[in-house]
């Protein structure tokens, strides 16, 4: 596939190609040194835009489809492969390097800039079709990765041709200069995406703005610096193409907010009552009107379902409160619902809620629907909200600080939460627990994903916290609180769990029981708890290795 090239005879002039003749240098409106600088500046900007396109696809795919490690691997590997194809294809354009580069950048700006909006549209309006289109969003993700990769890969050979036409240079030095500008541009794009574009503009507008910058710089470089090498027809074609691309991107930018609202209604239904982006995630509340129960979605995944959240939170909290419980730590639980159940027990003096997203805790405190559901738990003086990384917080926490720890975290299968189900993390929890303290862990649906559930059990035991498993059934087959199978309209995802699985751990294997001094739970009884222990035991898988930071098992 890669064609061999014979070395040029000593003293022979370079083969420039291009419309001005095979050996003619570019006719520039500026001095060669300035022209060379402008080409390298264009390389810098195009590299930054290219990396933003890659990161935007990874981020959006992780949000829409889930499993960020898999999505990053798919996008990056497909894109790098496509870049190789683009480099080979660009050899046919070397004779028309200026016109080819101008057309290439216009196409890349349109495809890359619109990719986030088109991918989100397919997910929102066709994600529930199933059948032959069950993997539609995944197919489109691969298609965009291929297209963007081919276009990015074709840039370098054409830019190499252009920079050599500006001023002849030793090929090794030209490649070094070109790659230096390319890599520095990629650094700037890689830092701009998470720290500027994503928090201030969002994924859709950020991608559209990147496409606009890409189109403007590409057109300016070709139509400004190399315009004398273009025919009149080529100049008008490039000018028209870039004007159309910029008009499309500008129109999409103006309509981005309306599009996002329409897509959100397509995903969640028409009863969206709150939709906010915190500094960490998108939080959506639906229902709580005309008798419809309130549902809470975090980054598109159902986290709380008002119709049966009480069954989940009672099963998570009450068995752990069967012993000393004056000092309680809740991991996650920013919605305040686990804190609500903790505060029902007499003798509780302190409740620390360690939530990675303080914006969610603020919403749970101030939103009328959610604060009513959590019975205004954050208004209790005993409750304190802590934010930040759980690892860092626990490392700085003195030993034996808490009598009870409640782990109200997403399923271990969600990549971002995997480290919070590791042996190292449970070792930190063991240290902060009092000698007779208890740890309750939501470990995912034991029926649907037994291997992941019992891996959590093996990890707890490896950390010196033997556990007793129990399950509680949901009232229907849909995903409920604490389960994170993926966005509601995900085209393909794990099966919806029929119940929730929990592990109650301590330094010595505890006996799950309810606190007789506490108010009676609404749905959990001693008999149902004992039955849940027996049902979970029937699914036990022995001999599983623990999950660690360097070797996650989920």
Swiss-Prot record:
- Which residues lie within the region annotated Spermidine synthase? 235-516
Keyword Transmembrane set for record: yes
Q: What is its EC number?
A: 2.5.1.16
Ranges that cross the membrane = 37-57, 69-89, 106-126, 139-159, 184-204, 206-226
Q: Where is the PABS domain?
A: 247-492
Which keywords belong to this entry? Cell membrane, Membrane, Polyamine biosynthesis, Spermidine biosynthesis, Transferase, Transmembrane, Transmembrane helix
A molecular function (GO) held by this record is: spermidine synthase activity
Stretches of Low complexity bias are at 485-495
Q: How does it sit in the membrane?
A: Multi-pass membrane protein
Residue positions annotated to bind S-methyl-5'-thioadenosine are: 281, 355, 389-390
Which SUPFAM superfamilies does the record cross-reference, listed alphabetically? MFS general substrate transporter (SSF103473), S-adenosyl-L-methionine-dependent methyltransferases (SSF53335)
Which pathway, per its entry?
A: Amine and polyamine biosynthesis; spermidine biosynthesis; spermidine from putrescine: step 1/1
Organism's domain of life?
Bacteria
- The reply to whether Transmembrane helix figures as a keyword in the UniProt entry is yes
Name the residues annotated as catalytic in the UniProt entry.
Answer: 408 (proton acceptor)
For spermidine, which residues are the binding ones? 313, 335
Q: What class of enzyme is it?
A: transferase
Q: Name one GO cellular component term.
A: plasma membrane
Segments of this protein annotated with the region Disordered: 1-20, 476-495
What residue spans carry the Pro residues bias annotation? 1-13
Localization, per the record, is: Cell membrane
Q: What does this protein do?
A: Catalyzes the irreversible transfer of a propylamine group from the amino donor S-adenosylmethioninamine (decarboxy-AdoMet) to putrescine (1,4-diaminobutane) to yield spermidine.
Give the quaternary structure.
Homodimer or homotetramer.
Q: Which family does it belong to?
A: Belongs to the spermidine/spermine synthase family.
Protein's name according to its UniProt entry: Polyamine aminopropyltransferase 2
Q: Which organism is it from?
A: Streptomyces coelicolor (strain ATCC BAA-471 / A3(2) / M145)
**Which gene codes for it?**
speE2
């Amino acid at each position: 596939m890669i064609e061999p090239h014979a070395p040029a005879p000593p003293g022979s002039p370079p083969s420039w190609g291009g419309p001005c003749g095979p050996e003619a240098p570019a006719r520039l409106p500026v001095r060669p040194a300035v022209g060379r600088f402008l080409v390298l500046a264009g390389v810098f900007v195009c590299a930054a835009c290219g990396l933003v396109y890659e990161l935007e696809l990874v981020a959006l795919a992780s949000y829409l489809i889930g499993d960020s490690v898999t999505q990053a691997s798919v996008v990056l590997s497909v894109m790098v492969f496509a870049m190789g194809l683009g480099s080979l294809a660009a050899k046919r354009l070397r004779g028309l390097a200026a016109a080819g580069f101008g057309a290439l950048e216009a196409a890349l700006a349109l495809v890359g800039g619109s990719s986030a909006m088109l991918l989100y549209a397919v997910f929102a309006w066709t994600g529930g079709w199933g059948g032959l289109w069950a993997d539609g969003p995944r197919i489109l993700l691969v298609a965009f990765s291929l297209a963007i990769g081919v276009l990015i890969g074709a840039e370098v050979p054409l830019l190499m041709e252009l920079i050599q036409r500006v001023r002849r240079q030793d090929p090794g030095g030209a490649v070094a200069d070109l790659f230096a500008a390319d890599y520095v541009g990629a650094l700037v794009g890689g830092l701009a995406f998470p720290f500027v574009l994503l928090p201030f503009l969002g994924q859709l507008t950020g991608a559209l703005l990147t496409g606009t910058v890409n189109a403007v710089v590409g057109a300016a470089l070709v139509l400004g610096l190399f315009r004398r090498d273009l025919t009149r027809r080529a100049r008008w074609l490039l000018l028209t193409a870039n004007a159309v691309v910029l008009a499309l991107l500008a129109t999409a930018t103006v309509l981005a907010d309306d599009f996002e609202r329409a897509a959100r209604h397509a995903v969640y239904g028409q009863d969206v009552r709150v939709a906010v982006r915190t500094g960490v995630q998108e939080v959506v509340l639906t229902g709580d009107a005309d008798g419809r129960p309130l549902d809470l979605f975090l980054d598109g995944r159902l986290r709380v379902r008002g119709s049966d959240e009480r069954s989940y939170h009672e099963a998570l909290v009450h068995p752990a409160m069967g012993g000393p419980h004056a000092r309680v730590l809740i991991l996650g639980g920013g919605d305040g619902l686990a804190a609500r159940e903790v505060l029902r027990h007499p003798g509780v003096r302190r409740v620390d809620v360690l939530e990675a997203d303080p914006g969610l805790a603020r919403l749970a405190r101030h939103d009328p629907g959610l604060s009513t559901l959590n019975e205004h738990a954050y208004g209790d003086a005993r409750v304190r909200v802590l934010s930040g990384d759980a690892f860092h917080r626990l490392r700085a926490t003195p030993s034996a600080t808490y009598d009870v720890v409640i782990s109200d975290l997403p399923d271990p299968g969600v990549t971002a939460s995997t480290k919070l189900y590791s042996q190292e993390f449970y070792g930190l929890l063991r240290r902060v627990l009092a000698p007779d303290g208890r740890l309750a862990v939501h470990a995912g649906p034991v029926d649907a994903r037994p291997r992941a559930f019992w891996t959590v059990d093996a990890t707890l035991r490896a950390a010196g916290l033997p556990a007793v498993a129990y399950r509680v059934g949901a009232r229907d087959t849909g995903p409920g609180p604490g389960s994170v199978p993926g966005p509601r309209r995900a085209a393909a995802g794990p099966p919806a769990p029929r119940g929730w699985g929990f592990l109650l751990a301590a330094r010595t294997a505890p006996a799950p029981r309810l606190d007789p001094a506490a108010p009676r739970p609404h749905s959990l009884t001693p008999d149902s708890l004992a039955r849940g222990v027996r049902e979970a035991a029937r699914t036990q898988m022995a001999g599983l290795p623990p999950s660690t930071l360097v070797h996650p098992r989920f």
